[in-house]
């Protein structure tokens, strides 16, 4: 090989690399240089000498790195074709580079070290231990040469562990060989790592204060850091005996290093991994040494030092790790301490709790939040929750919670010490807000556990806080959502106001405490007098601030259980709530109501409903008083919104359920619904509901847009229509018969019994609702017709978009963050269009809610309505072609699903089949077309036609809606057709330390899923059966992973099993099997989907191959299929006497057969495949003891190509 050839090539390569890395190079030159370099790596026969020449330390760093890349490429892609001598030469050359071809540890670039270690690891993966038995000895020898070499050895050992154990980037047999050899040599490796760490730490500590030896100290420190990083890669999976060897020497060293500033972070990482270990409890017991005096001292002093000098990022990151260490330590204690365990509560448990509490009270929201799960584990623990030390710290924990519940610390603000830390942890106020909300929900859970352990102290603290807030002057702060609205109390609060954040936190605290107290204490232990005193104070508190009033209402609801002991306070409670139902910030204001005011009024209505639902017996004696009050409010048409009116009616209906007398309740409902019936059944209304043109004129969508501030001429019409629909829904939803059968009989609710002996009930609202049903169906028919293009053309600007989605709905579907500061002073609807959109959206959904509730509410009285199927088909299912996805989806969910699920079996043929047959056929056709459009769109979107970058783009919204509709349809089919007989245990995780190959096909669908009676009924009808099968199997190739996963695992096989006994057309069998393979092509990159689809394909092939040869023809078309392997598989399948292989083995074989059609992730589709050959196996499963013999026998007779 001529050296000048190498020199010439190297010169060209240096130029090419320089061009590629030069920012001033043109795109054309850069591409040419890249092409030259890639072709060189692929084709040049003298890659190794060129790579070695370029990697010499005399070259510049980018050239050296490219030289090392060439060598790595040779090992990865050419190794199998190299001779023994070539391999030995390359190995020796690389080892020489490490020994003498690298710069000083402090000068050498990290990417050079990384590239060198990668080459060695790639060789190890191909040759160790069989052909390179002395690899560890060679690394040991290298490490003795100096700090640079020692650090490189650390890199090699770490990367080897990552590739073999963590990422598992090599074939199973090689992985097993290497991992088992590593395990056998672990004592040696571990002692090497520990000695390296100790030696370098000792040297570093000796010279770190000597300025003349600064570089020496830094070199030792760098090796120490590398040793800690490498240990972190092993601690996670090696046997616990190595971690706890020599009286927990490793843990001791790590604790000592916590106070060594340059090494403390790496030490904390190692400690965290060690303390977080799972596995046998017996093996983990030695970890309790960390509760000892010495370890505790080092951990706590390190925390104090790190937190002492203010906020420094490096120290703060370390503090986070230490916090995690304490969390993991607490979780280990909870796991190890049990009734049948000999582990005792540590003597330093009190000190641990105090130090842990220090993290809970730290200004950093992240640190506070990190401690919550461990507090939860401690408070739940059977033994620790009774420990006096833990009980003593609960008041302190609750005091900390009181502070932590207050929403402060936004990164953009400076009103709290938390803000500074938040600027490190969160990119924006929105990020902080999302984190804080989820963290506060978790804290609420833990707080409730603490309250359960000490309910009286908790209640006392909550009471004090409530009294304090009631007596404190309101501070709206400087950041206001409200422009000066004169209320006599200064400006109103915003969600950021100092008063509001305190009220909000106190309200959450009080709610949690009282709920737990009533659950925990006996009736006679409840502090009734104190509770009533607090309730009176809240009832007497008066405020005109809507946000504060909302908190006050929550406190009234929270304290309401005390009224069960003193019912005489009930009228006062209702008086407070009713005054809030009509709340206004400015009396007799003609201005539009603001969001804050609307929220208060809704809150008051909800509270009334909640009390009537949860305490109907308590409220019943006051029924007449309530009824009169509601009638008075309803008499003024403009005083309440339609939703508020109906909420109050719902509350009355809930109490009327306590009459437990059919006739009395029926008379009451008749009276309550009389105003609704008179509007709804009038001739004018009938004309409006039945005629689309009349409807458009009535609701005002043909009017030119008027000023939002002026009177809306059709507003009252829409209000009346909404009132009727809301009222019908409220009555249908809330009216029910007594749950107790004897009470139901006595009250006249039972009208007979079914053939199986179940009682048939009648609902007091049936008569009222059924007479309103015709007009309701007319409204639904008219509403559906509105979407026809010719009807939309009749609407005036801006109401042409009246049927569109609201912007808030679009944002929710696209997952866009909501604005942080809801503009509480802004009107509920910003524009007349927005008001109209909300009207149509609510009206549409409520109509279908009524139909959905009618079945479960009225039962046989609804299902026996004459020609019900025809009536529904001619109203709810009219003009579906023009109904958008966002309207069709709620219709399926709130109407079709309950209609079908609650239908008695005797009405399946007359009602369900005539509706679902055409519906499923239509839905399949619609979804297929939509997915076809989406697929074509993604194919057309090439480089020239870039996709719209706008996250709110219409295409993204449409695609997401199609996805959501698909899920709704598949869910409807599954609910109708499939019942799950048993829980699916297949997804249980493998046991710790299980070294068996876990095939992804282990995630199998539940074999217990069977067809329901309705499913069987539907499958009897050929048109419905075809629609169901085609929809289910076609959906496997639609671009929605979640839908595919559910359909594959729950629906496909039960449906197919139903038709297997009959005769299937060969074309149908081919299509079904091909559909599953297409699904694999689309979703094979997702492990869960791939496992379910492989299992389904396997089931179909096994069931149908013996009867249909055509299915074999499909298999033969799979790319790269091994025909001989397929023949063997078929032979075993078709010959029952041979078929004794375990199901898992057969499935694995089948998966290998169809591997050619399993889709890959985009990142792997164009990656060049690396082939690592298996070496003769060292380890035979039958005789595990031979492993050591093989190693000790100088390679056991195997050819060793790498001689030392």
Curated annotation (Swiss-Prot):
Protein biosynthesis listed as a keyword: no
Region (Necessary for interaction with ILF3), start-end ranges: 533-640
Residue ranges of the region described as Pre-miRNA binding: 641-642
Transmembrane segments: none
One term of GO molecular function: small GTPase binding
Region (Necessary for interaction with Ran): 2-108
GO cellular component, one term: nucleoplasm
Subunit structure and binding partners: Component of a nuclear export receptor complex composed of XPO5, RAN, dsRNA-binding proteins and dsRNA. Found in a nuclear export complex with XPO5, RAN, EEF1A1, and aminoacylated tRNA. Found in a nuclear export complex with XPO5, RAN, ILF3 and dsRNA. Found in a nuclear export complex with XPO5, RAN and pre-miRNA. Found in a nuclear export complex with XPO5, RAN, ILF3 and minihelix VA1 dsRNA. Found in a nuclear export complex with XPO5, RAN, ILF3, ZNF346 and dsRNA. Interacts with EEF1A1, ILF3, NUP153, NUP214 and ZNF346. Interacts with RAN and cargo proteins in a GTP-dependent manner.
Function, in words: Mediates the nuclear export of proteins bearing a double-stranded RNA binding domain (dsRBD) and double-stranded RNAs (cargos). XPO5 in the nucleus binds cooperatively to the RNA and to the GTPase Ran in its active GTP-bound form. Proteins containing dsRBDs can associate with this trimeric complex through the RNA. Docking of this complex to the nuclear pore complex (NPC) is mediated through binding to nucleoporins. Mediates the nuclear export of micro-RNA precursors, which form short hairpins. Also mediates the nuclear export of synthetic short hairpin RNAs used for RNA interference. In some circumstances can also mediate the nuclear export of deacylated and aminoacylated tRNAs. Specifically recognizes dsRNAs that lack a 5'-overhang in a sequence-independent manner, have only a short 3'-overhang, and that have a double-stranded length of at least 15 base-pairs. Binding is dependent on Ran-GTP.
Protein name listed in UniProt: Exportin-5
Species, as recorded: Homo sapiens
Record gene name: XPO5
